[in-house]
A protein has these predicted regions:
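Protein-protein interaction and targeting regions used for scaffolding, dimerization, and localization
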Residues: 1-29
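Conserved mixed alpha/beta catalytic, RNA-binding, or beta-rich assembly cores of soluble enzyme
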Residues: 32, 36-148
Length: 148
């Protein structure tokens, strides 16, 4: 395995930016990056099943995608093959419950998850979502999301 120094990364970024004809990032400037390969989007009905009647989501911090946020709420994802605890729930609430995992996470849980754009549940896998107040059998909800 090769490890890159901060200077190596700066040099690589500068070379790519120069090749693509873009402007360079001034030295010392930070470029925000968010990566969340394991999270859940819930419907209002599923949020109530998991967290109790009348319970919505409690915003914790805004995400870089406008209108979206990380909530205080956390869930557990369970299959016959394994489980992940403390999984982030993102808001706002949606029309369909969606679970986004990395392909590695999906494989670890024994889920066949298609690589789809967020919101496209075509061929999506199944998982059980466990909250402090209830359980949701989320059929056709698991995808490995394309970068978005």
């Amino acid at each position: 395995m090769h490890y890159y120094s901060e200077q190596d990364i700066r040099d690589i970024v500068a070379a790519v930016v120069a090749r693509e004809g873009g402007a360079s990032v001034p030295s010392g400037e930070k470029v925000p990056v968010e990566a969340s390969a394991r999270h859940v989007h819930l419907t209002a009905a599923d949020a109530e099943k998991l967290f109790g009647p009348g319970h919505g989501l409690t915003p914790k911090r805004d995400l870089s995608q406008p209108g979206q946020y990380l909530s205080e709420e956390r869930v557990k994802l369970v299959t016959a093959k394994g489980e992940f605890s403390n999984v982030a729930v993102l808001g706002p609430l949606r029309k369909e419950t969606q679970v986004e995992l990395s392909l590695t996470d999906a494989r670890a849980l024994g889920i066949s998850a298609p690589v789809n754009l967020s919101g496209d549940l075509t061929g999506a896998g199944d998982v059980v979502i466990v909250g402090p107040k209830g359980v949701v059998e989320a059929r056709g909800s698991v995808i490995a999301a394309r970068a978005h």
